[in-house]
């Protein structure tokens, strides 16, 4: 959004944020070691403010921050309660809060300085200047747009688990490999889980190209075998060769577009299908997911419909998020949701239901139709080789992975336009 609308991005940090919350209940604690009052050892301390370690500390801090901002005209985004905005006189500012990390998006430096000054008066703040690294994600801004990357995080993972000097792999997952449940003793289960845990954040933040592989391999964390390790090592080798990759947002087009896909019964041990979706905005991917479906489907059509239903839930949330931001042009158009199954599209556009369809399929069909009829989404057909959600459902060749990655804005940082 900053790339699309030319917003300036700055960053601040709240020092000891959880100590700022105001308590609603009476809470007492033992006198801390080294500060026990002589002769009053049996007495306890009554807390006047929130404290780190209290279960209500995060909630009290957020309520304090929320009251502080809304008191000076900021409005809470209805789709995300940690996003605030204020707009007037042709100027606007958006503030995003993640625990104690704050990103400030402004139309000019004047409004950003005003917000910084106000926050510094209310809380103990650290001004980090123009946004650089937040939540292990590095922001690079230039004339061509904004790039989000985690090359430093990838290098840290590879070094930690001994893959930094490994041979690179052309794809994160070998499509010819069929993984089955391990019936023997687990092979280094703790280390396997640690690697998967480290990769999950990377896959969800800036590397959609490894989402399917990580999602697939995470299903075997309880009892990994040697073949699961071989597949996991392939992901690490792929990261060795693509360490410098990041998502580049050129800012165009400033239109939200989605892609949905499913892979029906691709596993001999698991008869549940795999869903995948990705949404792009401003020239790059902004939301994506690869996951196993929670229900059993009886055909490819039902699997595709289930995946489409999951995609529409994300579509609705993303559209509400945009509609509640003043910098976005109104009205926000219906989200174009691309699907490569024509039978599903016919069913969505047909008002009649098939009596043979199971109840859970009918419910999902009705949900998709409701969003289509209300103007939230428009479902359209796209060829499989152009469906950006295809790599989120199965292992594919390097040519397909590279092509989809470029369409999602994912490319080496050193060759950014």
Q: What kind of feature is each model-predicted range?
A:
Residues 133, 220, 253-255, 273, ...:
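RNase H-like nuclease module associated with reverse transcription
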Residues 18-23, 27, 267-271, 288-291, ...:
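Cytochrome P450 core scaffold surrounding the K-helix E-X-X-R motif
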Residues 1-124:
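Metal/cofactor- and membrane transport-associated sequence elements
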Residues 110, 121, 156-175, 399-417:
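Retroelement integrase C-terminal DNA-binding domain
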Residues 51, 127-246, 251, 383, ...:
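C-terminal reverse transcriptase regions that engage the nucleic-acid substrate
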Residues 2-6, 237-262, 331:
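Structured nucleic-acid-interacting core domains from mobile-element enzymes and related host factors
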Residues 199, 259-301:
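RNase H-like nuclease fold core
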Residues 13, 29, 53, 65, ...:
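Mobile genetic element proteins and their domesticated derivatives, centered on retroelements
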């Amino acid at each position: 959004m900053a790339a699309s609308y030319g917003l300036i991005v700055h960053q601040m940090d709240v020092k000891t944020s959880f100590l700022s919350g105001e308590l609603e209940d009476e809470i007492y604690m033992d006198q801390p070691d080294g500060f026990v009052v002589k002769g009053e050892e049996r007495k306890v301390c009554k807390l006047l403010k929130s404290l780190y370690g209290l279960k209500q500390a995060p909630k009290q801090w957020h309520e304090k921050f929320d009251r502080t901002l809304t008191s000076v005209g900021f409005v809470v985004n209805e789709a995300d309660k940690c996003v605030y905005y204020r707009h007037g006189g042709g100027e606007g500012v958006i503030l995003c809060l993640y625990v104690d990390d704050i990103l400030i998006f402004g139309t000019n430096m004047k409004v950003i300085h005003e917000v910084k000054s106000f926050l510094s008066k209310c809380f103990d703040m650290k001004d980090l200047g123009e946004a650089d690294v937040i939540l292990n994600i590095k922001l690079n801004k230039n004339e061509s747009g904004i790039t989000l990357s985690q090359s430093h995080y990838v290098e840290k993972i590879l070094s930690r688990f001994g893959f930094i000097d490994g041979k690179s792999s052309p794809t994160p997952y070998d499509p010819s490999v069929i993984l089955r449940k391990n019936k023997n003793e687990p092979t280094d289960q703790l280390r396997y889980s640690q690697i998967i845990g480290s990769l999950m954040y990377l896959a969800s933040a800036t590397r959609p190209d490894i989402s399917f592989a990580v999602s697939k391999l995470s299903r075997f964390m309880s009892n990994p075998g040697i073949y699961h390790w071989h597949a996991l090592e392939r992901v690490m080798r792929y990261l060795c060769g693509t360490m410098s990759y990041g998502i580049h947002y050129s800012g165009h087009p400033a239109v939200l577009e989605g892609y949905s896909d499913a892979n029906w019964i691709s596993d001999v041990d698991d008869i549940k299908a795999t869903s995948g979706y990705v949404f792009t905005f401003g020239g790059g991917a902004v939301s994506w997911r690869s996951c196993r479906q929670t229900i059993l489907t009886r055909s490819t059509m039902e699997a595709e419909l289930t995946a489409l239903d999951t995609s529409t839930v994300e579509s609705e949330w993303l559209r509400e998020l945009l509609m509640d931001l003043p910098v976005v042009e109104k009205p926000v158009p219906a989200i174009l949701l691309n699907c490569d199954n024509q039978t599903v599209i016919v069913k969505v556009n047909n008002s009649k239901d098939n009596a043979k369809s199971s109840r859970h399929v009918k419910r999902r069909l009705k949900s998709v139709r409701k969003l289509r009829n209300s103007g939230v989404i428009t479902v359209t057909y796209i060829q499989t080789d152009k469906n950006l959600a295809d790599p989120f459902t199965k292992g594919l060749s390097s040519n397909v992975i590279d092509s989809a990655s470029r369409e999602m804005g994912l490319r080496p940082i050193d060759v950014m336009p």
